[in-house]
């Protein structure tokens, strides 16, 4: 990781790439490594088939940090990344196995931001890091699950997506603890209990619907079947 790595959305024109450079304050392109993502990357990292390169607009700048710094995400164009919060990006990146990086996200036009993680993965691989594709796909699932729940509760003044992000962290930590203590993944009943307890702890159990709770339970079951559950690094990044 000699230089920051910038990954542009494949749908950007040359002018838009220059505008994105300006958003990242890149004055001299010799100081960064630049690449871009396309529909093949969506398939390779996220398992999304039939993606459209021209729809990939959001871009990322990724810089490696010292060990122990954790994953820090800054959304530079908050008005244009309409669906995903910086905490949701960070949590999902940690699930995928990303550690100790600073990620800046920017988009020249309004986008959901759901594909930005693809750029993060591409940046890591460009710097010689290997990713577990089961984990990158579950991380995408996580992003979509939290985003869907937030969307479903957009008109609910009692809902707070920050508390949902905290509940997600709690769920991951508890599942890891169960596996460590009993030597095997949580049973279906234990998973339900972990999700119920986390939602109660962060005052969400009476706020989100049973349908949303079921989505979280489904995600938790998938999550504990990846190597993220055994990773000490994940637990350290989550703290």
Where are these regions (language model features)?
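N-terminal, leucine/charged-rich tether regions that mediate assembly and partner docking
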Residues: 1-104, 126-127
């Amino acid at each position: 990781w000699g230089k920051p790595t910038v990954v542009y959305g494949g749908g950007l024109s040359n002018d838009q790439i220059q505008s994105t450079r300006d958003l990242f304050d890149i004055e001299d392109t010799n100081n960064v490594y630049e690449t871009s993502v396309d529909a093949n990357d969506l398939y390779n990292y996220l398992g999304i088939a039939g993606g459209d390169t021209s729809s990939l607009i959001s871009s990322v700048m990724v810089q490696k940090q010292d060990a122990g710094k954790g994953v820090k995400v800054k959304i530079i164009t908050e008005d244009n990344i309409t669906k995903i919060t910086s905490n949701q990006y960070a949590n999902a990146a940690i699930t995928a196995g990303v550690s100790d990086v600073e990620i800046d996200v920017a988009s020249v036009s309004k986008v959901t931001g759901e594909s930005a993680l693809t750029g993060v993965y591409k940046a890591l691989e460009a710097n010689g890091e290997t990713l577990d594709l089961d984990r990158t796909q579950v991380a995408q699932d996580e992003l979509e699950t939290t985003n869907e729940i937030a969307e479903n509760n957009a008109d609910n003044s009692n809902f707070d997506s920050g508390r949902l992000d905290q509940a997600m962290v709690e769920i991951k930590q508890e599942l890891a603890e169960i596996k460590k203590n009993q030597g095997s993944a949580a049973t279906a009943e234990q998973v339900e209990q972990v999700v119920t307890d986390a939602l109660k702890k962060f005052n969400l159990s009476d706020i989100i619907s049973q349908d949303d709770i079921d989505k979280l339970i489904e995600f938790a079951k998938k999550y504990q079947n990846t190597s993220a559950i055994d990773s000490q690094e994940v637990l350290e990044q989550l703290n």
